[in-house]
């Protein structure tokens, strides 16, 4: 409904003022466009909220040339002279202080949650029972960061607001501004508190928060995010709107009233945020605290607009302080996480050399942080406004370094040096694999990703050296030093010994390393290929050169147990994490 009503609309609503005939001079009410006679308007009749508001008539108004203003002490700055001794054209204009309270109480009802949900953008409304949820992944759009439209709810019928405004002006003129202030504040404050209580807002202390299990903790925070968004964007916005209409021109009571109406409710909302921020920190909490930080950033324009007046300064500062405290909590929690990684002393031994639980946990943790990249950049800008990107990359580098240091310590639990290298290769590669995507490079920096790739290659080469150099020596003949060549012939016994040693060592490697695990298919295949490229040509050359000498004798299969094809097939068993038959299939 428009704030401007013409005379026709007024007559249709039956609240048109009755113009006196003894004075033809009219004045215009600049706020609503209604024309009043300078000396008189019709006094209000009793209000019954169950009857049509059209029966409500305008309250007696008798202004002079001065506008109504109230100073800081609540004192009116004009003199009111009733020339007609309480009568205007025979109409009773005696002031009745109960009308304002009666109408305000009758039309001030709590706003039901469903009404509020209807005022939200569709993507922020609670899902219906049959819609379900599609997971917990963080989506900035779903948290209200996108451009979305909100509809301020109607908390008092628009047709009642001009009536309340006129009554409020009457009370001020009669010198009852303090009664007006107290009546309006108490009624609206109680209704606002009831609306928030019906919505689900409740007070929690730091100790309440620390006793919550993780699921309850997260649910409470997600509810709080919805509550504070609804409260600020809908309830507080609507409250300020009607306050400005009803108490228009009654400064400073208007802003002071709004401040005192909302301060308790807003304080209760913020108290939960403060309780979260100062409660015991843990790495798992950082994501929901980031969600809280995001909503506080999202609501900053509303804080500036809704709490922009001087009486609301403290509320605006409390909101800003909570935002900073949440940012500090996130920063300190991530720093704690880095320390916790390096100090992790879990004795879980990964016997097959596969990815350790700590590695998968850290990688998953950092991947979740990727989803908050814009938020983290903004957050770190509060602490390093010159270069938040460098600070963010430094934090991520510290986490990766802490993980590698811890893995180095855990790798010492293996007695087999080759398994140590395989374990480190697996774990560092797991990080690289999870950080391939472009967002990760932007988040961590390409240098960090490339550094970890080189570390993977180093561990792979060290594994090959430790595992395969010894066996390759069995099938390598150096004529100048070995002493095996004499008169262009090789003694069969020495050749047989070399074959036997090779067979024994390969079977041992096969038996042991087929139980080791390289879970990533790409890494597993590349490692097998690297082994095959060295082993198969060397064995093939040795077999081609010395095989005929053994095959010409008895029991040749005792010494030549494998063909190059057998070795290639058996290499495919490596790193499967299984117990396999080591006998070659001929």
Curated annotation (Swiss-Prot):
InterPro entries, per the entry: Cullin_repeat-like_dom_sf, Exo70, Exo70_C
Keywords, sorted A to Z: Auxin signaling pathway, Developmental protein, Exocytosis, Glycoprotein, Membrane, Protein transport, Transmembrane, Transmembrane helix, Transport
Single GO cellular component term: exocyst
Region (Disordered): 119-149
Compartments, as annotated in UniProt: Membrane
Top-rank taxon, per record: Eukaryota
UniProt note: phenotype after gene disruption: Alteration of root gravitropic responses (e.g. delay, auxin-dependent root directional growth and larger variation of root tip angles) resulting in deeper root system architecture (RSA) and enhanced drought resistance. Disturbed PIN4 distribution in columella cells associated with a perturbation of the auxin distribution pattern and an asymmetric accumulation of DR5 in the downward peripheral layer under gravistimulus.
Topology in the lipid bilayer: Single-pass membrane protein
Keyword Protein transport: yes
Glycosylation, residue list: 65, 106, 321, 487
Main location: membrane
Regions crossing the membrane: 258-278
GO biological process terms held by the UniProt record: auxin-activated signaling pathway; exocytosis; gravitropism; intracellular auxin homeostasis; protein transport; root morphogenesis
Tissue: Confined to the outer layer of the columella cells in the root tips of young seedlings.
A Gene Ontology molecular function term of the record: phosphatidylinositol-4,5-bisphosphate binding
Pfam families to which the protein is assigned, alphabetical: Exo70_C
Miscellaneous: Associated with natural variation of agravitropic root growth upon auxin transport perturbation with N-1-naphtylphthalamic acid (NPA).
Similarity annotation: Belongs to the EXO70 family.
Biological function: Component of the exocyst complex involved in the docking of exocytic vesicles with fusion sites on the plasma membrane during regulated or polarized secretion. Involved in PIN4 exocytosis and gravitropic responses in columella cells. By monitoring PIN4 distribution in columella cells, modulates auxin repartition and subsequently regulates the root system architecture (RSA), thus being a component of the auxin-dependent root directional growth (ARD).
Subunit structure, as described in the record: Subunit of the exocyst complex.
Name of the protein this chain belongs to: Exocyst complex component EXO70A3
């Amino acid at each position: 409904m428009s704030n401007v009503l013409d005379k026709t609309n007024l007559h249709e609503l039956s609240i048109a003022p009755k113009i006196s005939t003894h004075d033809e001079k009219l004045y215009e009410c600049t706020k609503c466009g209604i024309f009043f006679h300078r000396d008189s308007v019709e006094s209000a009749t009793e209000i019954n909220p169950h009857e049509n508001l059209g029966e409500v008539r305008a309250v007696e108004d008798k202004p002079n040339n001065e506008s109504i203003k109230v100073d800081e002490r609540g004192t009116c700055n004009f003199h009111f002279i009733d020339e007609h001794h309480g009568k205007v054209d025979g109409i009773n204009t005696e002031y009745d202080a109960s009308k304002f309270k009666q109408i305000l109480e009758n039309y001030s009802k709590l706003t039901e949650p469903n009404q509020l949900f209807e005022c939200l953008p569709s993507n922020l409304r609670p899902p219906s029972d049959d819609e379900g949820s599609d997971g917990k992944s963080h989506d900035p759009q779903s948290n209200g960061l996108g451009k979305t439209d909100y509809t301020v709810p109607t908390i008092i019928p628009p047709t009642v607001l001009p009536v309340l405004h006129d009554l409020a002006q009457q009370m001020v003129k009669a010198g009852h501004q303090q009664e007006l202030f107290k009546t309006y504040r108490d009624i609206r404050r109680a209704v606002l508190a009831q609306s928030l209580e019906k919505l689900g807002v409740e007070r929690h202390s730091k100790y309440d928060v620390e006793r919550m299990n993780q699921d309850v903790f997260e649910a409470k925070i997600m509810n709080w995010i919805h509550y504070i968004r609804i409260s600020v964007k809908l309830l507080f916005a609507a409250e300020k709107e009607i306050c400005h209409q009803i108490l228009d021109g009654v400064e400073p009571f208007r802003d002071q009233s709004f401040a005192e109406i909302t301060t308790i409710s807003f304080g209760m909302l913020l108290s939960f945020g403060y309780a979260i921020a100062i409660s015991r920190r843990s790495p798992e909490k950082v994501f929901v605290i980031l969600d809280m930080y995001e909503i506080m950033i999202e609501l900053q324009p509303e804080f500036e607009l809704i709490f922009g007046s001087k009486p609301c300064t403290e509320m605006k500062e409390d909101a800003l302080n909570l935002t900073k405290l949440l940012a500090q909590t996130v920063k300190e929690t991530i720093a704690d996480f880095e320390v916790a990684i390096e100090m992790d002393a879990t004795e879980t031994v990964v016997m097959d050399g596969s990815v350790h639980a700590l590695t998968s946990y850290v990688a998953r943790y950092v991947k979740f942080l990727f989803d908050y990249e814009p938020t983290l950049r903004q957050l770190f800008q509060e602490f390093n406004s010159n270069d938040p990107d460098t600070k963010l990359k430094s934090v991520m580098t510290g986490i990766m370094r802490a993980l590698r240091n811890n893995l180095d310590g855990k790798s010492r639990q293996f007695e087999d040096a080759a398994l140590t290298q395989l374990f480190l290769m697996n774990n560092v590669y797991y990080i690289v694999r999870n950080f391939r995507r472009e967002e990760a490079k932007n988040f961590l920096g390409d240098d960090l990703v490339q550094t970890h790739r080189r570390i993977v290659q180093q561990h792979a080469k060290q594994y090959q050296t430790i595992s395969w150099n010894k066996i390759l020596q069995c099938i390598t003949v150096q004529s100048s030093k070995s002493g095996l060549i004499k008169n262009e012939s090789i003694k069969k016994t020495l050749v047989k010994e070399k074959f036997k040693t090779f067979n024994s060592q390969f079977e041992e490697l096969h038996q042991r390393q087929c139980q080791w695990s390289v879970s990533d298919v790409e890494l597993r295949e590349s490692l097998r290929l690297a082994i095959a490229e060295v082993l198969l040509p060397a064995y093939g050359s040795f077999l081609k050169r010395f095989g005929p000498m053994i095959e010409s004798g008895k029991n040749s299969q005792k010494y030549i147990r494998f063909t190059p094809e057998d070795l290639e097939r058996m290499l495919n068993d490596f790193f499967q994490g299984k117990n396999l038959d080591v006998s070659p299939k001929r």
